[in-house]
Curated annotation (Swiss-Prot):
This is UDP-3-O-acylglucosamine N-acyltransferase. It catalyses: a UDP-3-O-[(3R)-3-hydroxyacyl]-alpha-D-glucosamine + a (3R)-hydroxyacyl-[ACP] = a UDP-2-N,3-O-bis[(3R)-3-hydroxyacyl]-alpha-D-glucosamine + holo-[ACP] + H(+). Pfam families: Hexapep, LpxD. GO terms for molecular function: N-acyltransferase activity. It comes from Bradyrhizobium sp. (strain BTAi1 / ATCC BAA-1182). The lineage of its organism: Bacteria, Pseudomonadati, Pseudomonadota, Alphaproteobacteria, Hyphomicrobiales.
Length: 355
């Protein structure tokens, strides 16, 4: 449930109004004036809360819930205890999220931690920087020469924006984030402690005089509506740019190497490592801790399971996993085959009196 100390409490709302807002149906219309004051999980909800149920894994929690009302699909409607008002929705979780986005709009993107509504007197801003009206700069942030920042953007405490960086409108740059050599679009959310635009890992290795550093003269381009999780690092390109496509959502602690191109509306879970010069298509989903070798192409719509190591190109809409990654059907068949070999060998050893 939402904590009042961190987020605003929503106004009390009747079940009739909630059902209408969620495009759902209140099964017992006589309970339309029942008041709900917040949203909560089944096992934490009280009589004033709305919960949701859409997975039999939580059937025990549904049976024991003290919630005042529950969003539920027609399939599971009969499982709701009699004391809980049933709000029928074809997709309960989507309906729940729709309500949450309305009731807790302040939780959708970070606000100023210090209640700033302008530029803090403790910020350092180069005179040549151009900030549109409505930019918020928190204490101890540093903004370099010739930086441009659009209206509605918040620059968090201790963030550093290097020379000539351009940041669009309605963005959020988290506290202690460092940005250089980057062009950033509108409505980009960058969580705290990210590093964007530092030089990539480019060397000529093991020469006569050791490792020779290769100049990294490209940029980082981040398109509109991208979200970047805390602690993520994105290296600038060596010659061509590192590009993050529109609408892509990146989790915490992801490393993106130089010259990587990521398409639109991709999903990257935590602790992924992408080596340099990768090309990733649109609508690609990568599970947590995936590692991908350099100079590969991952086709549109591909999916890779968590903790996989990718050393080959993946075709469009491919479903791959494992180490090294391969099509999931092949991977599963190999796992079954290995388990069968181990089982058969164990049985043979027992028959022969071996441990």
């Amino acid at each position: 449930m939402a904590q009042p100390s961190f987020f605003q409490s929503p106004p009390p709302t009747t079940l009739a109004a909630i059902a209408a807002a969620a495009n759902a149906t209140l099964v017992d219309a006589s309970r339309g004036e029942q008041v709900i004051t917040g949203l909560a999980a089944l096992d934490e909800a009280g009589p004033m809360h709305l919960a949701f149920f859409d997975n039999l894994k939580y059937a025990d929690q549904l049976a024991m819930t003290k919630a005042g009302a529950c969003l539920v699909s027609p399939r599971f409607e009969a499982r709701v205890p009699s004391h809980v008002a049933v709000v029928r929705a074809n997709q309960p979780f989507r309906a729940f999220v729709q309500l949450a986005r309305t009731m807790h709009a302040d939780a959708l993107r970070p606000q100023s931690w210090f209640g700033c509504d302008g530029i803090s007197s403790q910020a350092i801003i180069d005179p040549s920087a151009r900030l549109e009206d409505g930019v918020v700069v928190e204490p101890l942030a540093v903004i370099g020469a010739h930086v441009e920042i659009g209206a509605g953007t918040i620059v968090g405490a201790g963030a550093v924006i290097g020379p000539h960086v351009k940041i669009g409108r309605d963005c959020n740059v988290g506290a202690r984030t460092v940005i250089q050599c980057a062009l950033i679009g509108n409505d980009v959310l960058i969580h705290p402690a990210c590093a964007i635009g530092q030089d990539g890992y480019g060397f000529i290795f093991f020469g006569p005089g050791g490792h020779v550093k290769v100049p990294q003269t490209g940029r980082v381009i981040i398109q509109n509506h991208v979200e970047i999780g805390a602690g993520t690092t994105i290296d600038r390109g060596s010659l061509r740019d590192t590009v993050i496509g529109e609408g892509t959502k990146i989790d915490n602690q992801v490393q993106i190497g130089h010259n990587v191109t990521i398409g639109r509306h991709c999903l990257l879970a935590a602790q992924i490592g992408l080596a340099g010069s990768l090309t990733i298509g649109d609508n690609v989903a990568l599970g947590a801790k995936v590692g991908i070798n350099n100079h590969l192409t991952i086709g549109d719509g591909a999916q890779v399971t968590a903790m996989s190591g990718v050393k080959d190109d993946i075709p469009p809409n491919g479903r791959w996993g494992g180490f090294f990654a391969k099509p999931t059907k092949q991977w599963f068949r190999e796992i079954v085959a290995v388990e069968r070999l181990v089982r058969d060998q164990t049985a043979t050893n027992k028959d022969e009196g071996q441990e």
